[in-house]
Amino acid sequence: MRLFTGIVFCSLVMGVTSESWRSFFKEALQGVGDMGRAYWDIMISNHQNSNRYLYARGNYDAAQRGPGGVWAAKLISRSRVYLQGLIDCYLFGNSSTVLEDSKSNEKAEEWGRSGKDPDRFRPDGLPKKY
């Protein structure tokens, strides 16, 4: 219900017409799929230092969908950062290495959302399928 309310509010604020609203919602759903694929690749790649690249790639792919994709990428990225921060704080306390890693991941996500090439963060040795 909150998601629906948020989408309606965003459409009112942005002055989106009914046709644009449908395309915004479609782009957002496609962006969710792009982000989900990136997070799935993070889980199965099991490659050291691949997180930043895959975060950037997921945000880049979602942003290529349009404004709805950018909105979905921001929402998912911020939710992940918030939840990961809570879990890290609970399990590890306030660690400076956790904070640095979180900041670098956020930088990679913003890089991807801005439409810049995510290959900047690609680690050596990561298989081509990613």
Swiss-Prot record:
Going by the entry's taxonomy, the superkingdom of the source organism is recorded as: Eukaryota
**Which keywords appear in this protein's UniProt record, sorted alphabetically?**
Acute phase, Glycoprotein, HDL, Secreted, Signal
Reply yes or no: does the keyword Signal apply.
yes
Which residue windows are transmembrane per the record?
none
Tell me which tissues or organs this protein is expressed in. Expressed by the liver; secreted in plasma.
Q: Where is the signal peptide?
A: 1-18
- Protein localization: Secreted
- Function (record text): Major acute phase reactant.
Query: Assembly and partners?
Result: Apolipoprotein of the HDL complex.
Which named protein is this? Serum amyloid A-4 protein
Q: Identify the species of origin.
A: Homo sapiens
The opening ranks of the lineage are: Eukaryota, Metazoa, Chordata, Craniata, Vertebrata
